[in-house]
Amino acid sequence: MSGAPPYNPQSPTQQSRYPVYSPPNKNRPFYSNNDQYQQHPPHTPPAYPSQPAAMSRSPHHPHAQSPLPGTLPPLNGAAPPPHHPDASSQFQPHAAAGTPQYSLPRPYSGSVLSSNGTTPYGPSTASHAHPSARPDGPPHLSPKKEMEPSFSMGSHGVPGYPPSAMREPRLASPPKEVKPARAADPMSFASILSGPTEDRPPPRKPSPPEVAPAPLALAPASAARQSPPLPISARAPPLSKEPEPAPVTPLPRLEKKPSSEKRRRNVDQEPKMGELSVPPTNGLLDPAKAAVQPRAPPRKTLSERETEYINRVMAELDSMEKSDVESPGFEWELERYTAKGKKRAMDAERAESVRRKRRRHDFLIKLGKTFEKQASAGMDRFRMANESSVVAEVQAKEVQDEKERKKDMQRKRRRENTVRLEMQKKLEAERKANKAQDSAEKAKFLREAERAQRKIKTTKRALEGVTAPEEIGEVTPLAPNLEGGTTSSFHIGRSPSRRKSGRGGPVTRPKKSKEQKQAEKDAAEAAYAALENEELLPLAPRDDRKDVLRKDGKGVLSKEATPIPLSSYESKGYNQIYEQIWRDIARKDIPKVYRIKVLSLSTRQENLRKTAQLASKQSRKWQERTNKSMKDTQARAKRTMREMMSFWKRNEREERDLRRLAEKQEIESAKKAEAEREANRQRRKLNFLISQTELYSHFIGRKIKGAEGDESGDTAVEGANEAAQSKMDVPAGALKAGAGVTNFEDLDFDAEDETALQQAAMANAQNAVQQAQDRARAFNNTKDDPMAAMDEGELNFQNPTSLGDIEISQPSMLTAKLKEYQLKGLNWLVNLYEQGINGILADEMGLGKTIQSISVMAYLAEVHNIWGPFLVIAPASTLHNWQQEITKFVPDIKVLPYWGSAKDRKILRKFWDRKHITYTKESEFHVLVTSYQLVVLDAQYFQKVKWQYMILDEAQAIKSSQSSRWKNLLGFHCRNRLLLTGTPIQNNMQELWALLHFIMPTLFDSHDEFSEWFSKDIESHAQSNTKLNEDQLKRLHMILKPFMLRRVKKHVQQELGDKVEKDVFCDLTYRQRAYYTGLRDRVSIMDLIEKAAVGDEADSTTLMNLVMQFRKVCNHPDLFERAETKSPLTTAYFAETASFVREGQFVDVGYSTRSLIEYPLPRLLCSSAGRVDVAGPDNLHAGFRGKYLAHMMNVFAPENIKQSIQEDGAFSFLRFIDTSMGDAYEQSHRGVFERALSRRGQPNRLSRLNVVYEEDEGDAPLAHTMLNIVARNDQSAVHEITPDGYMRELMTVSQSTFEREGLNVIEPCASPAASAPPVTITSSSPAAQIEMSDALFNVPVRHALFSTPTRQLEEQILEKKLDPVPYSHPPMLPKPTSLKGRYTHIEVPSMRRFVTDSGKLAKLDELLRELKAGGHRVLLYFQMTRMIDLMEEYLTYRNYKYCRLDGSTKLEDRRDTVADFQQRPEIFVFLLSTRAGGLGINLTAADTVIFYDSDWNPTIDSQAMDRAHRLGQTRQVTVYRLITRGTIEERIRKRALQKEEVQRVVITGGAAGGVDFNTRNRESRTKDIAMWLADDEQAELIEQKEKEALDRGEVFGASKGGKKAAQKRKRDITLDDMYHEGEGNFDDASAKPSGAATPVSTADVGGTPSSTPVPKRGRGRGTGKGTSKRAKTTKERLRLIDGDGGLGPM
């Protein structure tokens, strides 16, 4: 294949040809000899034949030269290795070695690519003797191709070693004939793949031709043997030590980088490469140019000494004895050489095969890409050539289609109108026919009706698109068979005749021959031709007529006859007669003939139609006779089969129902029996647990009483009371001697005998008591071992020797005086400490649980010398209170406050990490006070210490036994635990059970049965008002009595004021009602109930979010969408500041608004030269005007005025206006503003001239005395004397009316859509900028206009104690027309409307006004922090002083805030969050508590109101609770009352009464919440459906599919979590927001997630109402009121 490759060189930045061989380093240099497109793709070379090793290097069997380099190119963009200095110019790398890494892609041209026919797979024949422009040395590699090994076969079989290894001196070589070895084109394949040329420089003369080609191949080797030895540096490595051939695709191998000198030389050679890189136009290089500008530096000429040395060495070699080639001793070397040659040949063949495949594959890919590119280009050309015409054609077609569509629509309308008119005509004709008396007239009307009917049918067919003739379309729905054929091809389009055939048997149709069929076809065709010619068909067929008809029919269908030409007769009379005859014919005869023809046609068509119908009936008779019996048989068989199937189905269904009924009865009876057995088993299990707890309580009580008797000497102390309290009769020998502890799992509750259970309960209870005492005894009896304490790293505590008298008095170190009930509590706590029992002090809030706990620590320190360590854990909000109380009441006990950052806590731990042996009075601390959060964080440090006493304040924080806080606290080493809580029961009985489990984990184990009994019976009693088992209640009280002490205020504290609770009901405002109705219409209560029955967690979360949205509506609608501040679109530049933090208390913010439009003035106009009124060296006119016109020639000069003031001079009027000559001269030099400013404040001395009335007419001034200088009338105008009075109003009618009607206080009705400051004038002159600033910010002018004194002037007035009246003047600018809008168009939301938009806030506004007048102070509690933000705006609007405390308040700020409220009576309101501000703080300065929104946990509200109703409160505390009527808040309040009743029944033991608990008994909390969203009607409907479902034995709301939620339950997200996330936990960083509490986005107005379906109207869609007309009106009114706000589409 000849010619250059059919493609262009590829840029090195393009995609690699071989992706799988891509090198790891992408920054290698580009070697042009390894270009991807210099392979010869079209040829697929044949595989190498197996050759001997000797032939592998022969020129007769050459290998194709490898396209890969002989050596690995240097990495990282280095230059190729240096060439040998003595190498020939043909083998030296030319100046291209110094080219950049990436060469530019060359275009396809004959000057670069080869044009000869040299193939790369055989020996190439050079075309001329010029040296190659392509180096044979280290070729360049493409940066995208894989590196090949350093070994490759050359074109003559010579291994491709580096040039330095193959180049030998050529001095002793015989002269040879120089043959052209390469093509002239350095980029051709022949130039690359041909063998090496002669190693002589170009200037040498060609040598004579060589003898044979074989020695040519062996010439380098022989020359190497005969050449004299060279120095070591220039000597090539011997062939015997040549490296083994490397694999075909090895990893890249690193080589040394060339020196900087060689690299610099290559860079210097770049221009030479540029000169040589442009070949001549004919594609050949000029030898002269190549000789003059060689590619490599000239060879070094040998000196005479070196030449002599070389000759001497060569002579010595010639004189040496020649060895025999066939001599033995080299067999192994020969074999090794042969093996290596074969191996090299095989490796080369294998590598070449791989490369051949890769070249072929790459060529095919390239070819495919070329075809694809050409196809794409062809498509683009076609598109460019034809796109416009196609678009025009399509547009024209669309236009034509649109015209046709319009025509069709017009035709359709005309036809419809025709049908309507013809129908009217038909009805009218039928009506007239019915009324007609004459038969002819009646027939006439009937014909008219028939014509109208036919026209209607025709028009309807045209409308329906039916194009078949009427007479054919009515016979059969199929098209007519024009080709003829048998009658069997007719379609059965009519029902069979009602007449039954008289024949009984089946009738077979006779067969027809081909002749008969052909005759029928001919007859049909002739008939059709006759119909087309409008000829009548004969009654009998005639053969001759048939042929004529056939012939005429075909002729008519095909072509009409040519008329005979007639010659015209030209005559005027003839023409007139002819035209008259034709006129008469057209006027009279043609319509008549037309009517006759139409009538005959209709008659003929009707006859043909009847004939066709009769023929169709006749043709179907044989089918009826043939298929009738078979169809009847099949129908009877099918009917019988259906009846049988229905019978057996019914039978099987009945049997299945009976079987299921029997099975169901058996299952129900089995379930009933199993339920009874399980009930008995649960009863025994519960009885065992209660008995065990009762026995433990009994033993504890007996131990305490025994200790009391031992100490007092009386063993019968309160024996009767004990017997009355505990009615248990436990004999002394009831417990067996060997009875041991029995695990709960090992007990058999199925046995009928309960004696074993009783014994096990008694043994377990006694063992629990013994364990508690042993544990306390072991804690106290720890021996003092300092070394052991040092070794173990734990503390050693002293043991009290005696507890002293049981009647404990107040400790002397306690500075406060304990009350009687507090002293009893101290006795109870000491008794518990003595027995080693933990307890719960559950006194009502405000009774001094803190002081009782402190007194216990003081007692232990004073009486028993136990100084700790004591651990107090409290909420973060009460830590400062604990520290202050301990320091205040017991100064001897040292307190270590443990809170702060991690670094601070690490420093504090040094106080108690030291290994103290004892804790004495001199210890560094005795009590450590910390919070629950820090205990959990530093639990590892607290567990190392043995605490003497651990006090947990507000113990409801550990109400969950599954929390990490509960588990960590349970693992602390302490002798006793004391829980302080004012509300042991908050939500349910399980919380109380968790506290009991915490104080006695061994006894009060977390048994599900006991917990269920605790919760279910009592709560169901509170809900359903049922009778609680008195025995169970007494047993419960007996269980709780030894461990819990609770007193209430009304029983123990008589001097404490009363607490009055009032529920204040509020109504929804119009806006709130619209929001509430919109939310309720978006959800379906029935769907929520059904989903709640399934128990999906996602639905529960959705329901809680809905409750949140409803409560937000009740609080304030602005929680959804705030009224925004509105202003026009201002196009201006505004100054920006980063922060005001570094500014002082007073920040002067200057006017910095600039217009976007700037008008630049030339510098000349702003200078003195361009100003007419500014004098200067460049402006002589201003000086002339000022000197001559303003002074010398001024008419207001005093001299001129003096001369002109006499008699009737020009200035004689000055005497009448009370102006002197000096004043007139001074005013002439002032501007308008200065003159107005000087007149400000001066009284109108001439106002008396305006007086037109006198008390007496006689006192009226005379006419000649009115202009006298002496005042004759000192009376002033009445309207100026006083601002009040009728005269003042009469003189200012418009102003007084405007103010009296309130027009100046209404809000502006409209505002401009956009605003902009004036155009800014700019100039490059600094003086112009200064002048404009002085004009804009002139302080005296601004003070005169706005009457606003500067801050500096006010400070001077205060410092110098001056009278401010002279410095205060009314503003010169008039008052604004609107006091709301004033001088700005910025509209701020109205606070009055902000108050009236919420019913609660409006009621609170009235309440606070009354409380403020009565001198009360208020605690205002909220559930939502965003509502507190809104309340702050309201209090600022009403000018009420307030302070705030919520979950975001810092710990140090909280203490100062509480102290400010307690000590500053001017603070009227204290805003608190229910959770954050309801624990452990004393706010007795307030006597009024207002709950803006209540918590559904009543104990939280009780704690909050007890912040004011506690010890130290001397006034009556009034609690107001704001409740929105008819909303979800009423139902939440009812639920809170139920919880209060549970607490009262359990703790106080009272009976249920006083509260109506006849509410719904729901087991599912989610269903209860869903019921809160329903109104009364919906609740009644749901109750009715529940009752119906219970009557049917179904579960209301359960899924019919029977699918159960089997997935693992997540932690319940309660509404408390959603309301109070982050509150109450000041330092709790782990509390992450749930994302459901108080969303800020206004997009959540609806509050309904996407998963909640919107109810639809109709049957079975629940009670959700759709959008009514009233709702739409509400939405429109809301948008009008709120400024296009609201809930969106409802």
UniProtKB/Swiss-Prot annotation:
Molecular function GO terms recorded: ATP binding; ATP hydrolysis activity; ATP-dependent chromatin remodeler activity; DNA binding; histone binding
Entry keyword DNA-binding: yes
This protein's GO CC annotations: chromosome, centromeric region; chromosome, telomeric region; Ino80 complex
Biased composition (Low complexity): 213-227
Chain spans, region Disordered: 1-306, 395-527, 618-637, 1619-1690
Coiled coil: 392-468, 623-694
Residue span, Helicase ATP-binding domain: 830-1002
Database matches in InterPro entries: DBINO, DEXQc_INO80, Helicase_ATP-bd, Helicase_C-like, INO80/SWR1_helicase, P-loop_NTPase, SNF2-like_sf, SNF2/RAD54-like_C
Record note on domains: The DBINO region is involved in binding to DNA.
Complex formation: Component of the INO80 chromatin-remodeling complex.
Protein name: Chromatin-remodeling ATPase INO80
Natural source organism: Aspergillus terreus (strain NIH 2624 / FGSC A1156)
Species lineage: Eukaryota, Fungi, Dikarya, Ascomycota, Pezizomycotina
Gene (UniProt): ino80
